[in-house]
């Protein structure tokens, strides 16, 4: 919350025919994290990257892996992603059945030496986080409905970032707040960073840019300006 701005490009938007080239580009850009979207075709209407991909990605880069699990029954698969090399794991609170499951997920991630995070869809009330906020390293606020890249930012998502920041100020001032969906240096970065976001996920905004390295730097600089 209001910490150093971190950029976490979404690898789902990379050129998979030139994958290692894009990884080296992210390293050259000084990206802080690599965002890995895992979708199962059930929790969200798309099917994407899985455990073997995370393991192979971990083998070719030292950039920390920010793994976002958009899957049903995440407790069943969570150990696989922890073993594969995730450095930070976000689980959707909507995919967990009750308080016991939420706490078990956080404990499992923490016990593996990995940083735990909870993710929220745009229609999930922020106050559901209150019992867990002190046990988390990060909250992921979705500013689009998860499932497909390239969507437009949902207006007012910055208000939800502010609500998370208010909880963090009371219970966990070191909490990171990540925002994913329609993030652009020209417009939405300022909105979310003014409210407390400090981790920015961008897919097409980085990989489809004429100069992806400059795009990463522009996101970081726009966030710093908004925080000033």
Language-model features: where?
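Short gly/ser/thr-rich secondary-structure transition/capping motifs
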Residues: 119-123
């Amino acid at each position: 919350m209001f910490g150093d701005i971190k950029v976490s490009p979404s690898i789902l938007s990379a050129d998979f025919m030139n994958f290692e080239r894009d990884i080296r580009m992210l390293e050259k850009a000084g990206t802080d994290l690599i965002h890995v979207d895992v979708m199962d075709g059930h929790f969200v209407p798309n099917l994407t990257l899985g455990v073997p991909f995370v393991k192979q990605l971990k083998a070719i880069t030292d950039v920390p892996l920010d793994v976002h699990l958009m899957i049903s029954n995440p407790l069943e698969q969570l150990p696989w992603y922890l073993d594969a090399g995730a450095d930070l794991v976000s689980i959707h609170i909507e995919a967990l059945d009750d308080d016991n499951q939420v706490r078990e997920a956080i404990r499992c991630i923490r016990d593996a030496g990995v940083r735990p995070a909870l993710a929220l869809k745009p229609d999930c009330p922020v106050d559901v986080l209150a019992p867990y906020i002190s046990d988390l390293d990060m909250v992921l606020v979705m500013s689009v409905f998860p499932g497909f890249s390239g969507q437009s930012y949902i207006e007012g998502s910055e208000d939800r970032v502010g609500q998370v920041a208010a909880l963090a100020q009371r219970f966990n001032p070191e909490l990171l707040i990540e925002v994913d969906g329609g993030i652009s240096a020209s417009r939405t970065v300022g909105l979310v960073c003014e409210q407390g976001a400090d981790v920015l996920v961008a897919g097409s905004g980085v990989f489809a840019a004429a100069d992806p390295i400059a795009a990463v730097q522009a996101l970081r600089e726009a966030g710093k300006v908004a925080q000033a």
